[in-house]
């Protein structure tokens, strides 16, 4: 059912998913999302490289060489292209009115490189004015077990999940979904959001706290870009359902690791603990 009217609702309940830039021989992202197609969703590929198109079509996936040719509204795209190409893909997605996209592509501000920072700022400057729902970059994107959208080929498909999980780490997102599923605890929705340059943790919490398919919210967070908003959103969420927060970067070594991992700046631990107590 989701949260009709919420800016993230189409992305969390997609009817059309597009994988951009997948490559053989495994075609990981298309293979991960085959259950979405099998459940009746529209799964398409956008790939310009002629060497890859035959392999994509052998999977039974229709490929397009232009975003403008993809039929119907694009609810969610998974983008796996070199970082220098990312702004061009984002431009095309915005031009066709796509709702949102997860950018698996890394190599942005988390590297500390001038080019990476510049490219990340370019994505932000393009996405925000367009009100485009950019997940990431440097992330695994969405896992929606009820409709068959996955960021890992072993993640279970299940209709009974009631746990919403958010993770700034792709590895933690994958491992939690696998371990939880192996122990009979299925997820309702999961987002791995990496650098969180447009959509921040607060945006996902705001959705999950209103989602009647989610009874409890768990999260792994390395940092919030707007601490006050995160506090207010978390406070409201806790009135509605249980929330479990796992904070990364709590030591000096951990803080350095999160900076190089997702570009998250360390926050004062006492301030963080005070916020959690409130």
Give the label of every model feature segment:
Residues 1-278:
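Catalytic-core regions of core metabolic enzymes
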């Amino acid at each position: 059912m989701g949260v009709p009217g919420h800016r993230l609702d189409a992305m969390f309940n997609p009817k059309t998913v597009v994988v951009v830039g997948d490559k053989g021989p495994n075609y990981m992202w298309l293979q991960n999302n085959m259950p979405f197609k099998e459940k009746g969703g529209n799964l398409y590929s956008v790939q310009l490289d002629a060497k890859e198109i035959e392999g994509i079509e052998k999977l039974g996936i229709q490929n397009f060489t232009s975003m403008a040719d993809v039929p119907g509204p694009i609810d969610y795209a998974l983008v796996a292209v070199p970082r220098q190409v990312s702004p061009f893909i984002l431009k095309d997605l915005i031009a066709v009115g796509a709702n949102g996209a997860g950018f698996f592509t890394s190599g942005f501000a988390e590297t500390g490189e001038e080019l990476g920072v510049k490219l990340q700022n370019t994505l932000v400057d393009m996405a925000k004015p367009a009100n485009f729902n950019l997940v990431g970059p440097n992330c695994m994107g969405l896992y929606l077990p009820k409709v068959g959208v996955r960021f890992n080929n072993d993640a279970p498909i299940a209709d009974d999940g009631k746990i919403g999980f958010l993770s700034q780490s792709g590895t933690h997102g994958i491992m939690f979904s696998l371990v939880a599923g192996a122990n009979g605890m299925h997820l309702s929705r999961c987002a791995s959001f990496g650098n969180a340059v447009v959509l921040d943790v607060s945006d996902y919490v705001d959705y999950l706290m209103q989602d009647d398919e989610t009874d409890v919210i768990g999260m792994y967070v390395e940092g919030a870009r707007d601490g006050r908003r995160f506090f207010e959103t978390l406070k409201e969420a806790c009135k509605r359902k249980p929330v479990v927060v796992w904070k990364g970067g709590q030591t000096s070594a951990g803080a350095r690791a999160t900076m190089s991992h997702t570009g998250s700046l360390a926050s004062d631990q006492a301030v963080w603990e005070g916020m959690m107590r409130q």
